[in-house]
Swiss-Prot record:
Predominant localisation class: cytoplasm
Gene this protein is translated from: lysS
Organism in which the protein naturally occurs: Xanthomonas euvesicatoria pv. vesicatoria (strain 85-10)
Self-association state and partner proteins as the record states: Homodimer.
Cofactor requirements of the protein: Mg(2+)
Entry keyword annotation includes Secreted: no
Binding site for Mg(2+) 2: E422
Protein known as: Lysine--tRNA ligase
GO terms for cellular component: cytosol
Keywords assigned by UniProt, alphabetized: Aminoacyl-tRNA synthetase, ATP-binding, Cytoplasm, Ligase, Magnesium, Metal-binding, Nucleotide-binding, Protein biosynthesis
UniProt-listed InterPro entries: Aa-tRNA-synt_II (IPR004364), aa-tRNA-synth_II (IPR006195), aa-tRNA-synth_II/BPL/LPL (IPR045864), Lys-tRNA-ligase_II (IPR002313), Lys-tRNA-ligase_II_N (IPR044136), Lys-tRNA-synth_II_C (IPR018149), NA-bd_OB-fold (IPR012340), NA-bd_OB_tRNA (IPR004365)
Length: 505
């Protein structure tokens, strides 16, 4: 027995409209003309609007003299019947265009048009003209109904309850909200621009498994599944990192993947359990070079897609043009917490006292590195408005990053924050197999101590490192959050076509 999404409750007045439309569909079925599929579209509304935008050049006389005939199709978004002549507006993927309909030209099709509803999908063929108000219009010579819409489109699309409905019924949102369509068009352009940027620099796009025998590559709780034929428990990947670094071992020295990750965590305006990441690795690069790369790819993507490096995001004006600030984590913590000394930053007991004073709840198992991170997240993170790289994280919270040569207990790692939100994470990769094995073992102990997000021990990855991995820099950029930044969206749900929602009651 298969599970089904419960049918949403339909208001009584909407029920009557649906019944009326079903009756119209029944009549079409009786005529044998329901849902035809033989119309060939040749033109798009947006292209016509752009080509004939100059009203001074393309007067009604000039348009008609051109002899231009168009074949278009789209959704009926408005209609105004005025006896022997009517106006309508259709929408396709590129925009909208007005139709001018005349009864003496269309005959029976005009009579049929009077019974069509907003939301129906229609085809039109005809010449071009311009109305007295200057609006470009298709002067219909032929008109057909291609798809009968059974549900009425919403008259209003705002307010809290409707925002949730937009997420649940994105198909309706895309029909009636041009701004939503523009966000997802920009999302596609952003990903395309990033791919082009990396491809131009000899990075190789690869695909790695989505189901893992051992979850790894990030400290996160995984989703579990089961392979029936092999009788084997598997995990949806939390990150592709360990597979991508295996490829670096194999000699693919510049690799990247743009794909889904899955983390069994909470849902918020910043988090969705399924999300898109760009992850890349470059042999013979340090975390300083990867910071340079991160800064440049974000800046160039903004310029390519938006034509500017200045954006507004959640009430803040962000400038991506200047060099991004680089700030050690311990220095940032001390700057915002003058009571914390340099010596305190690596003193577990001192940091515990500061956490208690700051009312930060911590677990008894936390060492100084985790405590320092907790203080950073509570007191510093939200203050980082302009692009800032926070660098040199403690080893305890960076199990895959290379240890610092000059600062014991710290790593060659960075995170990028913009307007208080993390957008990227990268580091010089740990390529010492013995050090990595010891850190995996520490993660196993943390998991045994109740940390659901701690990593497992991946013996095959250790074996790969034992063959030798070149000094390597790695990077992960959250695509969803980058799209939020470049589209000014305040919720991750606004940049996901189908965000996760609780099932409807």
């Amino acid at each position: 027995m298969t599970e089904q999404t419960p049918a949403p409750q339909i208001p009584a007045d909407e029920n009557s409209l649906i019944a009326e439309r079903r009756a119209k569909l029944g009549a079409l079925r009786g005529q044998g003309i329901a849902y035809p599929n033989d119309f060939v579209r040749e033109h798009f509304a947006g292209d016509l609007q752009a080509e004939f935008a100059d009203a001074d050049t393309w007067t009604p006389e000039a348009l008609e003299a051109s002899g231009r005939t168009v074949r278009m199709a789209g959704r009926l978004m408005a209609k105004r019947v005025m006896g022997k002549a009517s106006f309508a507006q259709i929408q396709d993927e590129s925009g909208r265009v007005q139709l001018f309909l005349q009864g003496n030209v269309l005959g029976d099709a005009y009579t049929a048009f009077k019974g069509w509803d907003v939301g129906d999908i229609v085809a039109v063929e005809g010449g071009l003209t311009r109305t007295k108000t200057g609006e470009l219009s298709v002067k219909a010579g032929a008109l057909r109904l291609l798809t009968k819409s059974l549900r009425p489109l919403p008259d209003k699309w705002h307010g809290l309850s409707d925002v949730e409905q937009r997420y649940r019924q994105r198909y309706v949102d895309l029909i009636v909200t041009p701004e939503a369509r523009e966000v997802f068009i920009k999302r596609s352009k952003i990903i395309r621009a990033m791919r082009a940027w990396l491809d131009a620099r000899r990075f190789l796009e690869v695909e790695t498994p989505m189901m893992h025998y051992i979850p790894g590559g990030a400290t996160a709780k995984p989703f579990t599944t089961h392979h029936n034929a092999l009788d084997l428990d598997l995990y949806l990947r939390v990150a592709p990192e360990l597979y991508l670094k295996r490829l670096v071992v194999g000699g693919l020295e510049r690799v990247y993947e743009i794909n889904r990750n899955f983390r069994n965590e909470g849902v918020s305006t910043r988090h969705n359990p399924e999300f898109t990441m760009l992850e890349l690795y470059e042999a013979y690069a340090t975390y300083h070079q990867i910071m340079d790369l991160t800064e440049q790819v974000i800046r160039d993507t903004a310029q390519t897609v938006l034509g500017t490096t200045q954006v507004s995001w959640d009430g803040a004006d962000i400038d991506l043009a200047p060099a991004f600030r680089r700030w050690r984590m311990d220095e940032a913590v001390r700057h915002h917490n003058p009571e914390i000394s340099a010596a305190d930053c690596t003193d577990r007991e001192a940091l515990l006292r500061h956490c208690e004073r700051l009312k930060i709840r911590v677990k008894p198992s936390y060492d100084w590195g985790k405590l320092l991170l907790e203080i950073f997240e509570a007191t510093v993170e939200h203050t980082l408005v302009q692009p800032t790289f926070i660098t040199d994280h403690p080893v305890e919270v960076s199990p895959l990053a290379r240890s610092s040569d000059t600062e014991p207990g710290y790593t060659d790692r960075f995170e990028l924050f913009i307007n208080g939100k993390e957008l990227a994470n990268g580091f010089s990769e740990l390529n010492d197999p013995e050090d990595q094995a010891a850190r995996f073992q520490a993660q196993v102990q943390a998991k045994d101590g109740g940390d659901d997000e701690a990593m497992h021990f991946d013996a095959d990855y250790i074996r790969a490192l034992e063959y030798g991995m070149a000094p390597t820099g790695g990077l992960g950029i959250g695509i969803d959050r980058l799209v939020m930044l470049l589209t000014g969206s305040t919720s991750i749900r606004d940049v996901l076509l189908f965000p996760y929602m609780r099932p409807e009651a």
